[in-house]
Amino acid sequence: MAFKKKFAPRRKFCRFCADKDLPLNYKRPDILRDFITERGKIIARRITGTCAHHQRLLTREIKRARQMALLIYTATHDSGVQKKSSI
């Protein structure tokens, strides 16, 4: 027997289509950080809700910001090896 969902998920919308004043620019890493994971991966548009046009622009601007060292490529990697203390 299949269970029915109690509520429908909220409709996702493109933040950039809704707010025309929101700049999509590599110079604004504070906005671009909302669209990458903590590991540095670009979040898919089916999750963020951006339209196809703005997702392409968003991807291009994130890559530009990475080249300009405004955003990280990947998360910092801990090797798991502990450093010896100098006591």
Curated annotation (Swiss-Prot):
Coiled coil: none annotated. Pfam families: Ribosomal_S18 (PF01084). One of its GO terms (biological process) is translation. Belongs to the bacterial ribosomal protein bS18 family. PANTHER family: 30S RIBOSOMAL PROTEIN S18, SMALL RIBOSOMAL SUBUNIT PROTEIN BS18M. NCBIfam families: S18. This is Small ribosomal subunit protein bS18. It comes from Desulfovibrio desulfuricans (strain ATCC 27774 / DSM 6949 / MB).
